[in-house]
Amino acid sequence: MQIRAISPADHAALLDLWRRTPGLCVRAEDAYEPFCRYLARNPELSLLAEVDGQLAGCLLVGHDGRRGYLQHLVVDMPWRGRGLARALLDEALSRLAALGVRKSHVFVLRDAPVALAFWQAQRGWGERRDIQVFSTQGDAG
């Protein structure tokens, strides 16, 4: 397995992976231009795992200078159960720590049981019950 930084050239393959992954919701922000903006704003942080030259998994990683934000941690079905998700997560946290970012958040859809089970099993990660998340599309009047 090889882990490398995601590049804009990876977008089509990643979009295909995301679309066929249960529990992952592809949104307008996953289109090519927002994807490229995200990579440019967070250089060398988002990661792709390859096995024998094939896309096996990915993790989008960003930060605001204080907190890391992890999104779209996906391992393709044939590669699950081999430690790829944990390897991607470890590498992401290492890269964030090198930037001085030690605390990270991940948002997991409630109807994604595989993802929920993964995060619940990760040592050092805990579900926050003291906050609720509110979101906007930016067009609220």
Residue ranges with predicted function:
Residues 5-72, 89, 95, 99, ...:
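Acetyl-CoA-dependent GNAT
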Residues 96-108:
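Conserved GNAT acetyl-CoA-binding A-motif
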Residues 75, 81-94, 121:
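Conserved acetyl-CoA-binding loop-helix of GNAT-fold acetyltransferases
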Residues 1-2:
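Extreme N-terminal starter segment of soluble prokaryotic enzymes
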Residues 114-131:
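Short acidic, glycine/proline-enriched helix-loop-strand junctions
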Residues 106-116:
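Conserved beta-strand-loop-alpha-helix junction that forms the acyl-donor binding cleft
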